């Protein structure tokens, strides 16, 4: 059930969804306090992801890793995915702070664009661009591969226009975003089970996938439970939508590390892994 305590500094909420948390409990300028600040945690995962891509990060192993990613033209793709994650967090914070429809779009549309970026990176794992087109990868040099960027852009535009035209219908985002996540999940399984290059030692791809998938699953469970069991601004005494923010932010960060792992593996690099406060980050070791 939705709760609107008062209008706050932004007037009557215009967003299509007003979440479980009671509005303007702590400040007339922040509609949903916990949901707003937990949104910024999403951005922090993106900021951390970019930080570990910087040339001055870490010791010799990390510096060599970043150098390799630049040589393989992977670093910029990774940074773009983390920038999009930062935008999702900022947009989500604006949405939950104001409960205005235009800020809801600032939250929802970057979610679609971030998923499309990750999908594109994932589909192009293992391919090389040649004078005759593309070599390797799941699509090879097929017509579909050449049309892929345009198809993804068209999907993003279609969803954007649909959401703008048909307002107050959150299921449009839920279905369109859910379809992208569904594909990413199962294409990841395909990449894990794909035959690895001869002589390649084990790498942490399966571990990273499980880490990201479980994080996403826990976050989604929090989202669903809150929608159905909200009572007096909480769900079983917790702000579960804030947990959704944390776990989905962490999942997206780790999934990007998974993609880096597969991109390196396709170029015959061994991959190592380190943790900071339980958060994994991978690094290239050497070619085999």
Curated annotation (Swiss-Prot):
Tell where it localizes: Membrane
In the UniProt record, does the keyword Glycoprotein occur? Answer: yes
Keywords annotated in UniProt: Glycoprotein, Hydrolase, Membrane, Transmembrane, Transmembrane helix
Glycosylation is annotated at: 23
Molecular functions (GO terms): N-acylsphingosine amidohydrolase activity
Q: Main localisation, per the record?
A: membrane
| Transmembrane intervals | 41-61, 78-98, 105-125, 146-166, 172-192, 206-226, 240-260
UniProt-listed Enzyme Commission number(s): 3.5.1.-
Task: State what induces this protein.
Answer: Up-regulated by srfA transcription factor.
Which BP terms in the Gene Ontology apply to this protein?
ceramide metabolic process
- Cellular component terms (Gene Ontology): endoplasmic reticulum membrane
- What is this entry's stated membrane topology? Multi-pass membrane protein
- What's the family? Belongs to the alkaline ceramidase family.
What name does this protein carry? Putative alkaline ceramidase dcd3A
Q: Which organism is it from?
A: Dictyostelium discoideum (Social amoeba)
């Amino acid at each position: 059930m939705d709760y609107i305590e008062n209008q706050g500094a932004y007037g009557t909420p215009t967003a299509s969804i007003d979440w479980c948390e009671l509005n303007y409990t702590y400040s007339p300028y922040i509609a949903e306090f916990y949901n707003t600040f937990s949104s910024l945690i999403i951005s922090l995962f993106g900021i951390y992801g970019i930080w570990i891509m910087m040339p001055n990060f870490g010791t010799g192993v990390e510096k060599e890793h970043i150098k390799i990613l630049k040589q393989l033209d992977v670093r910029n793709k990774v940074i773009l995915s983390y920038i999009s994650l930062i935008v999702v967090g900022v947009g989500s914070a604006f949405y939950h702070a104001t409960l205005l429809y235009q800020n809801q779009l600032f939250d929802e549309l970057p979610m679609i664009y971030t998923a499309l970026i990750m999908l594109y990176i994932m589909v192009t794992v293992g391919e090389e661009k040649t004078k005759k087109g593309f070599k390797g990868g799941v699509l090879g040099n097929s017509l579909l591969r050449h049309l892929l960027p345009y198809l993804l852009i068209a999907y993003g535009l279609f969803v954007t226009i649909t959401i703008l035209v048909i307002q107050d219908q959150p299921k449009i985002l839920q279905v369109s975003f859910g379809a992208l996540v569904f594909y990413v999940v199962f294409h990841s399984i395909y990449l894990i089970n794909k035959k690895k290059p001869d002589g390649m030692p084990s790498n942490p791809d399966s571990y990273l996938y499980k880490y990201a998938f479980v994080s996403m699953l826990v976050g989604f469970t929090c989202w669903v439970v809150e929608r159905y069991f909200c009572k007096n601004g909480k769900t079983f005494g917790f702000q579960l939508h804030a947990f959704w923010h944390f776990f989905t932010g962490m999942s997206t960060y780790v999934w990007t590390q998974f993609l880096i792992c597969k991109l390196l593996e396709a170029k015959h690099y061994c991959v190592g892994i380190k943790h900071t406060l339980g958060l994994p980050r991978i690094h290239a070791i050497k070619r085999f």
